[in-house]
Amino acid sequence: MKPNKFQIKNTFDWYLTNVLPVVEHRAIQNKYGYHGLYTHTNAVVFRGIDYALSIEKSPEIVALACALHDIARTNDTPDPEHGQRAIPLADRIISEVPYVLTRPERDSILYAVANHTTGMLAPDYISACMWDADRTRISWECGFDAKFFTTEYAKQVSKNSPEEYLQFMRQHLSHRALRIMGELNKQY
């Protein structure tokens, strides 16, 4: 399924309005930089929404998981424990975001956040879309390896050039989103 331009744009704007302000207030991650909230995390949220729509799953739940994945990072150096450290903070943020989740959805988000650095394959669509969205940039930088991806669409995006996808992002983001994210480049 090819995601609808308005579904992506509307879901990303929902994230900017309902999720990003809570994450900005609570997260300890840097706002800019290689793992920055406004740079990397926003791009992971966008790709997560896109990947969720490609498999006809809830883009809001995936957007929330993506928004939380690096909230406990304190720098851009390798930090395999930041996912586990994020759990108490992620649980608190989930409680403050105006979106009703079932207990299994909440647990799946927390599992996805805690385990996104493990390199394993995803047990559910929330982990699949979030992990694939995060790993896409690594694939662009280090080379594509299908064994690290779950969704077919993410495999396709990850083996193509980042410039192609950045152009796709520019076409599917609102003016507000583009202002917040600034200049889109390969760092995303």
Task: Walk through the language-model features, giving the residues of each.
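Short helix/loop segments within enzyme catalytic domains
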Residues: 15, 99-101
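Alpha-helix C-capping/helix-to-loop hinge sites
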Residues: 29-30, 51, 71-74, 93-97, ...
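Short, well-structured alpha-helical segments
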Residues: 38, 42-45, 63, 103-114
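His-Asp-centered metal-binding catalytic motifs of divalent-metal-dependent phosphohydrolases/nucleases
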Residues: 59-77, 82, 86, 108-117
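An active-site-proximal "capping" alpha-helix that borders the catalytic cofactor pocket
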Residues: 43-51, 81-97
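Generic N-terminal amphipathic, Lys/Arg-enriched alpha-helix
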Residues: 20-29
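Divalent metal-dependent phosphate-bond-processing catalytic cores, especially two-metal-ion Mg2+/Mn2+ enzymes
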Residues: 1-14, 28-57, 68, 118-188
